[in-house]
Amino acid sequence: MKKIIALLLAAIMMLSLVACGGGNDEPAVDETQTIKVAAIETAYGSEVWANVAAAFTAETGIEVQLTTDNNLEDVISASMQGGEYPDVIHLATGRPAGLTEQFIKDKAIAEITDVLSMTVPGEDKLVSEKISGGFTETSLTNPYGDGKTYLAPMFYSPCGLFYNAKLFEAKGWTVPTTWDEMWALGDAAAEEGIALFTYPTAGYYDAFMYALIYSIGGTEFFEAVTHYEEGVWDTPEADTLFAILDKLAAYTHKSTPAQANNQDFTKNQLMVMQDQALFMPNGTWIVGEMAEAQTTLTNDFGWGMTALPAVEEGGAGYSYCWFEQAWIPAGAANIDAAKQFVAFLYSDKACEIFATAGAIQPVNGIASMLEGDNVMFYSIYDNGAKAAMGNFAAYTAIPGIDNTTVFFEPVNSLVAGTLSIDEYKANIVSASEQMRANLMG
C-alpha cells in the first residue's frame, strides 16, 4: 500500500519587520525547503525511514516528503514519466522491474562522488571516512568504470564460511587463513569422520565464488570474469580457481548434492551444526533460519563466521557482501539538498535508527551498535577481511544458458563425481563466449 508521509518538523520561521528609516519595509521570508524521498518497503518496514527522515529534518531544517511501498516502481513510475522525480530513491539493482538498471543504462542518475567529500550533517567526519573500505569501489556504485560514484551503498549483509565455534574450541583447531591450512584441517577432520565442507544448495556458490575470485586476482580478475572477457579462462588465475574448486569438491560431504535442493537444504546446514562438516557458505540470515533447529541440538554449538582464506600466506581473505543502493535521479529538482540527505544516511543517528530494524549500514565500527551474533558477523571487515562486491554483467537472454546453470549448479556434479573439472571449465568457456556476444549496454 502506498504510504506518503509528509514530515514537517522544522520550526516555523518567524517573520520579522525591521524599521529602515522611513523606507518601505519588506518581510524577510525564509521558506523551508522540502525534498521528496522514495524508498522501497522491505522487511525493515516503513517506520524506520520515517524516523530517519524526521532526524534529518531536525538536523538540517530540510523537510522530507516520504513515499514507501513494497512495489515502489509502480508508485513512482507514472510521475517520473511526466518529468517529476523523487529527489532521492532507495531502490537496489536486481529487482524484477529493473528500474534502477534502466536509469543506469540511460545515464539518468546524478553523480554523487562529491558526497564522499561532504561532512556528515551533525558530525565532523567526512562521508568517505564513515563508509567502510571498498563499498564505493565497485560496479554496483560506480557502474560506468570511470572512477565516479553514482549509487550510494546501503544495508549490507556479509556472507562467509559458517562453522561451529564450540567444536573448534574443543578440538583446539585454528580457523584457516590460507587454503593450504584449509586442506590440512580437512585431513585432520577426516580422521575424526568429519567432512571439511558442505553447502545448502549449489546456488550458495555465487557469493562463495565471487569472494574466491577476488582472493585469487582482485578486482581486475573479478571484472574480467564477470564481463566474460576473451581469454580470461586461460590465465594462471583461472587455473588457480579451478584447482581450488576441484579440490574442495573432494573434501565436500558426499551427501551434500542429494540434499542440495529447496526441500532438503536445511539438512546440509545441519551438517555443520551437528559436527558432520566443518564449513558451509552462507549469510547472516542463517541464525534466524536455523534458530528452531538449534534448540534441538545435543552437541555443544555456537555460530562462528570467517572470510574465505587467502590463496597465499600474507594475502587477503575476502567476504562477499550483498548490499542495496540509494541514488539521485539526474532530473531531480533539489539535487543539492538530496546530497545532504544521502550524506546523512551514514550519520551515527541514522545508522542507529536503521539498526533497530535490522538494516545495517556499511560504516566503520558498526559492530559497536549491534548485539549478539551480529557483533561477530558485522565486524568481519573490521578484523582484516576485505569486501568482495559485484556480480555478473547482464546480457540479453540466451536459450538454455544462465549464470546459475553454467557456473553454480554444476558443483553438484563435481562433488558427485559425474562431471570432471575439465568438462566444467569447457562448459564455462563455451557459455562465456555467448554471454560476451550478448552483453547489454
Which functions belong to the PLM regions below?
Residues 6, 20-106, 122-128, 175, ...:
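Conserved N-terminal structural module of periplasmic/extracytoplasmic solute-binding proteins
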Residues 227, 320, 358-365, 379-437:
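C-terminal capping/gating helix-and-loop segments adjacent to ligand/active sites or protein-protein/ligand interfaces
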Residues 187-189, 227-260:
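Glycine-centered hinge/linker elements that transmit conformational signals in sensory
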